[in-house]
């Protein structure tokens, strides 16, 4: 399976708590089947599964952790589990330490959402060469860096460019041609930030919008608040904002509230964290993108167990995204 011919899991794109549980239950059933075919080396004791996430200050990763822990609690007879997150979005050293610690502690499977698509390849390659099964979720590792390190890992995650374009297109439709917008980017070193920027740029071009400015706020709420305040000073005619995640969208709305412009400038985000849903209902945000973070970690564990059972996955195993507006939240 090459990069363009990746397996597609978008049939899991369901909405609401009940349907989310269905996905988790379905994946749980898969692990129950595949765990029964683990190699003899794992028969003596349960496999140890580690999850390495980005910042737990970001509600998206809190949801990811909760989903994984719920899943693990229902599979205590199949594997032991530990989740580790960073204190903020640029705490790369914490991710490196977590992976190295899991290897030292002889974990069998590590599921990782890398904060840096290139820098994280080296510790991940060491884990792979130590015999650990590694599953890359959420943020794709750099292809050339993987090749240079001699590893071939599948990517289990969303179409970040396509998801951002869904949000950007919703904004373009609301503003019409000539609408003046700014973009708040994620960490420049992360592939998902790069892909979301491309998706927003696609919407700007196709919707004939005017891009006034585009800068990074490194996924962080307070940094986004400051950046948006500066944007409004530099560009008082802003009509719309594309934020590459909801944490930054929260910072944007905070800045708009302080300036008395909330609801007057349209805002789109990405992640569908609980905190933005009332803002969308109230008209302070136009839309966000659901990318099913809780299920993403479960899918990573599921496919990792399958790899330990002898299967091999390459390329891109696509997970779903969906545009969320006030209509979906009604």
Model-derived features with residue positions:
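N-terminal secretory signal peptides
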Residues: 1-36, 40-42
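A residue-level marker of the well-folded mature domains of exported/periplasmic proteins
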Residues: 12-14, 24, 43-330
């Amino acid at each position: 399976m090459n990069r363009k011919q990746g397996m597609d899991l978008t049939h899991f794109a369901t909405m609401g708590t009940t349907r989310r549980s269905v996905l988790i239950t379905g994946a749980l059933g898969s692990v129950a089947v595949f765990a029964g075919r683990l190699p003899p080396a794992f028969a003596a004791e349960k496999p140890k599964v580690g999850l390495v996430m980005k910042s737990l200050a970001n509600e998206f990763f809190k949801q990811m952790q909760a989903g994984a822990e719920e899943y693990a609690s229902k599979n205590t007879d199949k594997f032991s589990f530990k989740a580790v997150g960073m204190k903020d979005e640029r705490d790369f050293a914490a991710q490196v330490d977590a992976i190295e610690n899991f290897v030292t502690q002889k974990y069998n499977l590590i599921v990782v959402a890398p904060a840096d698509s290139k820098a994280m390849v080296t510790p991940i390659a060491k884990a792979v060469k130590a015999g650990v099964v590694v599953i890359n979720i959420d943020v794709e590792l750099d292809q050339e860096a993987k090749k240079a390190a001699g590893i071939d890992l599948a990517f289990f995650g969303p179409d970040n460019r396509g998801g951002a374009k869904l949000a950007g297109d919703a904004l373009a439709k609301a503003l019409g041609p000539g609408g003046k917008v700014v973009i708040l980017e994620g960490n420049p070193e992360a592939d998902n930030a790069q892909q979301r920027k491309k998706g927003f740029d696609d919407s700007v071009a196709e919707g004939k919008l005017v891009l006034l400015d585009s800068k990074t706020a490194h996924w962080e709420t307070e940094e986004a608040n400051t950046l948006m305040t500066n944007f409004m000073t530099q560009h008082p005619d802003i009509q719309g904002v594309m934020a590459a995640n909801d944490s930054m969208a929260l910072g944007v709305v905070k800045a708009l509230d302080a300036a008395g412009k909330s609801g007057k400038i349209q805002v789109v985000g990405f992640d569908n964290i609980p905190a933005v849903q009332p803002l969308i209902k109230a008209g302070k945000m136009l839309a966000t993108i659901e990318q099913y973070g809780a299920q993403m970690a479960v899918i990573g564990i599921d496919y990792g167990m399958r790899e330990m059972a002898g299967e091999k996955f390459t390329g891109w195993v696509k997970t779903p995204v969906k545009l969320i507006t006030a209509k979906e939240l009604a």
